[in-house]
UniProtKB/Swiss-Prot annotation:
It comes from Pseudomonas syringae pv. syringae (strain B728a). The keyword Cytoplasm applies. It is found in: Cytoplasm. Its main location: cytoplasm. The lineage of its organism: Bacteria, Pseudomonadati, Pseudomonadota, Gammaproteobacteria, Pseudomonadales. One of its GO terms (cellular component) is cytoplasm. Keywords: Cytoplasm, Phosphoprotein. Belongs to the MdcC family. Covalently binds the prosthetic group of malonate decarboxylase. This is Malonate decarboxylase acyl carrier protein.
Length: 99
C-alpha cells in the first residue's frame, strides 16, 4: 500500500459532499468534502506501488485549463484503471454540484 498526496489551485469550496464508488465492488472509492479555499487537496491510498506519476498525470489532465472547487478528496484505490478513476471523480463533482 502506498499513500500519495497532491495539491492543485482551486476556487471556493462547495457546500456539498459526496461518496462515490465502493472499494469492495470493483476497485475504487472516492470521498469529496469541502476544502480550504484556494486549494484542492487529494490523498490517494493505493494498492499499486510506484504509480505516483500515473496519478499526477491523470489529475493534471483533469484540471488543466479549469479551476476546480476547493475540495479535500480521499481516494481508496485497489487497482482501478485511469478511466474508472476519472469517471468516479466526475461523478463526485456532479454530485456535489446538486443541493
Amino acid at each position: 500500500m502506498e499513500t500519495l498526496s497532491f495539491e492543485f489551485p482551486a476556487g471556493q469550496p462547495p457546500k456539498g459532499r459526496a461518496l462515490v464508488g465502493v472499494v469492495g465492488s470493483g476497485d475504487l472509492e472516492v470521498l469529496l468534502e469541502p476544502g480550504k479555499p484556494g486549494t484542492l487537496s487529494i490523498q490517494v491510498v493505493t494498492s499499486v506501488n510506484g504509480a505516483a506519476l500515473r496519478w499526477q498525470h491523470l489529475f493534471e489532465r483533469m484540471f488543466d485549463g479549469q479551476t476546480p472547487p476547493a475540495l479535500s478528496i480521499d481516494i481508496h484505490d485497489f487497482g482501478a484503471t485511469p478511466g474508472v478513476v476519472r469517471m468516479r471523480l466526475e461523478q463526485g463533482f456532479e454530485e456535489i454540484g446538486h443541493d
